[in-house]
């Protein structure tokens, strides 16, 4: 499984879910952090998209919205990605949905922080 991209998002997490989510990205998705400091991790993908994880003490002064954030990981093999996140202890939500006319498939999962994320594959 290869992760091909995501859109930029910043997510604020309590310390325990911060660590678990960072571990999921590094160990399961094999994404190395471009920046990894106390309470902050920046993941920069080859296509230029970024994900920033913040623990509460590292949030910028201007803060972030209090509402939930969801985004999708574009992967090259949605079946392998589904198996990998499930093996990492994440809950798969629903079945893989295939939209043949768009050559697009997707599935959601609940990450270690309790948020819903997506997996998507474009052929």
Where are these regions (language model features)?
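Short secondary-structure junctions
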Residues: 30-36, 91-96
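Conserved short beta-strand elements that form part of the metal-binding/catalytic scaffold
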Residues: 31-66, 116-122
């Amino acid at each position: 499984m290869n992760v091909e991209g995501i859109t930029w998002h910043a997510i604020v997490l309590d310390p325990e879910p911060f660590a678990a989510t960072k571990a999921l990205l590094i160990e399961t998705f094999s994404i190395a952090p471009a920046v990894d400091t106390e309470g902050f991790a920046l993941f920069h993908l080859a296509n230029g998209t970024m994900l920033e994880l913040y623990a509460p003490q590292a949030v910028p002064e201007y803060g972030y919205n209090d509402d939930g954030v969801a985004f999708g990981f574009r992967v090259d093999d949605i079946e392998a990605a589904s198996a990998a996140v499930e093996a990492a202890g994440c809950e798969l939500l629903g079945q893989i949905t295939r939209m043949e006319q768009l050559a697009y498939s997707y599935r959601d999962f609940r990450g270690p922080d309790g948020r819903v994320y997506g997996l998507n594959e474009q052929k």
